[in-house]
Every structure is written in C-alpha cells, then in structure tokens.
Amino acid sequence: MVYGYQDASLRRICRAVGLTTGALYKRYEGKDSLFAALLEPTLIALDQYGQEQKRRDYAFLEEGHLSDMWAHRLEDLQSLMRILYEHKDIMQLLLFKSQGSSQADFRMRLPHLAADETYRYLELAYKEGKINHLVKHEFLRSCMTAYYTAVFEPLAQDWPQEQALEFCHSIMDLFDWGGLLGF
C-alpha cells in the first residue's frame, strides 16, 4: 500500500508475506491480477451500493414520486462515505496510487458510469413525461465528475471518518441535484 501499484514489487510483496514469486504466479498471472484480487471486495461493495440506489430510484420513477429521491440523499451519501471508509486503504490505493494498473482510470470512470446511468434514467423519466427538462449529457458528466471529486476529497486529505461524514453536509449544500435535474 505504501508504494502504490506502479512502485510495488512482486518480489518485495512475496518477501513480506513469506512466499516465493513462483507460488504467487501460480495463483495470479501478474501484478495486475493480484491488484484486481485485492480490489475485488471493495468494488463489489461499491457495486452493491450502486445497485441498491438504482433499484430504489427506479421504484420512485415507476410510482411517479421522483421528488422522493431527495428525501434521504444525505443519508445515502453518508452510507457511501461509510463504505469508502470501511475500505479506506484500498480506496486510497485505487483512487490515488493505481497508476500503471488496469484500474488507473477508476477515478474518472466511476463518475462517467454514474452519469451514463443517471442519463438513461432521466431519458426514461422525460419520455414518460415525469420531468419536463433533460439536462445535456455532457453537462451531467461534468457535474458528476465534480461531485465525485468532492466525495473522494476526504480520502485524498486523509480525514478521519467523522470529519468525512460531516463534510457530506457541505457536499449536499453544494450540489442541488433536484434543481439541476428538474425534479
């Protein structure tokens, strides 16, 4: 973790855990597959969080209660922040020390995926007449990138979890998603 992906040495890792490099290569194809295995539980936790949010938001759309999405957004953001802090070391590695790995673009890829998913949702809501304005996709992407930059900032600054949870209030004040998205 100290060295980050690019400066990590498989020999040094093997020495630290008492393995031979041959034993490591029997299980992992190389440094990137070892890195992927290290990240997997964290990525699964993030995906599960995202899937839960998606299910709930689509239920609001189906019921015609889009504005109810905003009722628990602070709690949702704090839940996400808790997940990030449950996996703090791995998240810091992934976000800030993954250069050279297949996940080096994660910090940019996540907001783009979130924007794409949100845009599909908005298109459906617009087609169904549940919203009367559709934000431009590129604007949404830029806003999502700014949002996730703010969400990841406590990890970048290595703040304690309580301070990160408190910062969620500021993030919510800064990002008026209901105003931007029109509901």
Descriptions of predicted regions:
Residues V17-Y28:
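Short hydrophobic/aromatic patch on the recognition helix
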Residues D76-E86, S101-K127, E138-T145:
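Amphipathic alpha-helical packing segments from all-alpha helical-bundle domains
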Residues M1-A8, Y28:
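Short helix/strand-capping hinge loops at secondary-structure junctions
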Residues E63, S67-D89, R141, T145, ...:
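Amphipathic alpha-helical segments that line or abut small-molecule/effector binding pockets
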Residues L122-L174, F183:
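Hydrophobic/aromatic-rich alpha-helical bundle segments in the mid-to-C-terminal region
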Residues Q92-L94:
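Short, hydrophobic secondary-structure boundary micro-motifs
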Residues V2, R12, A16, S33-F60, ...:
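Alpha-helical structural segments
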